[in-house]
Amino acid sequence: MEVITALHGFLGLPSDWDFLRMDVIAPDLRDIPREGDTLLGYSLGGRLALHALLDGARYRNAVIVSAGLGVEEDRDARLAQDEHWAERFEHGEWYTLMRDWNAQPIFGGHAMPRHESDFDRRELARQLREWSPALLPPVAARLHEIEIPVLWIAGSRDAKYVAEARRAVELLPNAELWIAEGAAHRVPWEQPEAFAARLREFIASRKPSTSNDAP
């Protein structure tokens, strides 16, 4: 049976993937398995998935959702932005923090309920600081090294990441693009049925043949 290694985004939980009703493992983002069937990464998890693949992780397929290719300009500005959020995740009032986080334009008004008790706030702040896109090296120049099939997904209302997705599939040797019409950044949870169907279709189309018939 196909096993999906699913990497959630920032402020994500392993249970975020329960809706898929597929054989899914959702590891800690610091302990990504080095091999498997399909590697699925959303947002921050998508960036970490790309770096894992470029670092030699062995998977048959990959699905990247709402992920960027890295910050090539204005890195100091992005670092300052991430530090601002890190300070708030460490010390800010939770309700106001969640309201402001979900009000960011990329989310298109879609909010995911999050309870403070589910998180270590110092760990969230550390993730923002250590995994800032301004610190991780940009990957565009190395995407040609990822030879496995890749499905890259973005929501049509998430203009920045649609542009990143289109650029990525031009650079990858074996990639498909799905723009989820009407969705913003959180495609899997805005359109769970369509997302799960597209994921199943991609995996099924890439399964190695098990036929023993003679040619």
Question: What is each of the regions a protein language model found here?
Answer:
Residues 1-33:
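Conserved HGGG/HGGXW glycine-rich cap/lid loop of the alpha/beta-hydrolase fold
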Residues 41-45, 49:
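Gly/Ala-rich beta-loop-alpha elbow adjacent to hydrolase catalytic centers
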Residues 159-165:
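Conserved alpha/beta-hydrolase "acid-adjacent" motif
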Residues 51-54, 58-90:
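Flexible "cap/lid" loop of the alpha/beta hydrolase fold
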Residues 73-77, 88-142:
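Conserved alpha/beta-hydrolase catalytic His-Asp/Glu region
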Residues 183-192, 196:
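Catalytic histidine-centered segment of alpha/beta-hydrolase-like enzymes
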Residues 170-186:
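Catalytic histidine neighborhood in serine/cysteine hydrolases
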